Amino acid sequence: MKVLWAALLVAFLAGCQGKVEQVVEPELEPELEPHQQADWQSGQPWELALGRFWDYLRWVQTLSEQVQEELLSSQVTQELTALMEETMKELKAYKSELEEQLSPVAEETRARLSKELQAAQARLGADMEDVRSRLAQYRSEVQAMLGQSTDELRARLASHLRKLRKRLLRDVDDLQKRLAVYQAGAREGAERGVSAIRERLGTLVEQGRARAATVGSSLASQPLQERAQAWGERLRARMEEVGSRTRDRLDEVKEQVEEVRAKLEEQAQQMRLQAEAFQARLKSWFEPLVEDMQRQWAGLVEKVQAAVGASTTPVPSDNH
């Protein structure tokens, strides 16, 4: 009899332990690397649109089970689609803006950079589409399990969304790196333009000297000092004009670079705060469930121990 009780107890405890581990699993979310947290920083329109996409998805996920089942409908999928299209539209617009700044760069370099950026853009779009597909799949499974417990489905959805979130972070990191290469190419093109102006200016100076020598020999009747002064004034005016254009172009490039950097830093801070808020909400979602399961587990163990102790207590004998 004792052997039978022990076997039943072991089987029961093993089943309870498996269930507890299955429910607790969604809470275990790995910490993000520092560079991944920094990726959600920047102030470009496409990154702000991506933030709205993820905020909407997080809003759906944090609702109660009943409200969540009501919202997981075709309307939610349509709204996610609209946010995805907005993100990709803003990203294409920003890419076109950078391509305009790459005009001085060689055609081969422009083609290579454009191809790499398109690949990163496609990966981001595919991962966003995967998020929408996972949500639609969850909706179908919930509808198929009406009247049954959906804790396992919610845990599985949370696990999928956590993995997809990390993939989105990697996509944003890759895109920002590609865009940084674009910006570097724009600066390189501007520097090449300045070098060309300097070379042209040097050529003009040499031509001016040669022409001055020729004119000086042909106009020997004019006073030498008067001719040199007039030619020097014309050359000085020409050099000042070219130098002014060069400075204006350099200032314009510097302003554009500073503006892009400021936007990147601003969005980086926003993305980091969003990531921290998302992590805090996930923790607050699953923490009460874990504590409740632990209390139930402790009570169950006490009851089983009490039952086993009662069954093994020897019965007093009436024989003296």
From Swiss-Prot:
Residue ranges, annotated region (LDL and other lipoprotein receptors binding): 160-170
Binding site for heparin: L164, R165, K166, R167, G232, E233, R234, L235, R236, A237, R238, M239
Sequence segments annotated as region (8 X 22 AA approximate tandem repeats): 82-258
InterPro entries cross-referenced by the UniProt entry: ApoA_E (IPR000074), Apolipoprotein_A1/A4/E (IPR050163)
Keyword field: Chylomicron, Endosome, Extracellular matrix, Glycoprotein, HDL, Heparin-binding, Lipid transport, Lipid-binding, Oxidation, Phosphoprotein, Repeat, Secreted, Signal, Transport, VLDL
A single GO cellular-component term on record: extracellular space
Sequence repeat residue numbers: 82-103, 104-125, 126-147, 148-169, 170-191, 192-213, 214-236, 237-258
GO BP terms: acylglycerol homeostasis; cholesterol efflux; cholesterol metabolic process; chylomicron remnant clearance; high-density lipoprotein particle assembly; intermediate-density lipoprotein particle clearance; lipoprotein biosynthetic process; melanosome organization
PTM-bearing positions, type Phosphoserine: S149
Gene Ontology molecular function, alphabetical: cholesterol transfer activity; heparan sulfate proteoglycan binding; heparin binding; identical protein binding; low-density lipoprotein particle receptor binding; phosphatidylcholine-sterol O-acyltransferase activator activity; phospholipid binding
Glycosylation site residues: T214
Record's subcellular location: Secreted; Secreted, Extracellular space; Secreted, Extracellular space, Extracellular matrix; Extracellular vesicle
PTM summary: APOE exists as multiple glycosylated and sialylated glycoforms within cells and in plasma. The extent of glycosylation and sialylation are tissue and context specific. Glycated in plasma VLDL.
Membership in a protein family: Belongs to the apolipoprotein A1/A4/E family.
Protein known as: Apolipoprotein E
Biological source species: Cebus capucinus
Lineage: Eukaryota, Metazoa, Chordata, Craniata, Vertebrata
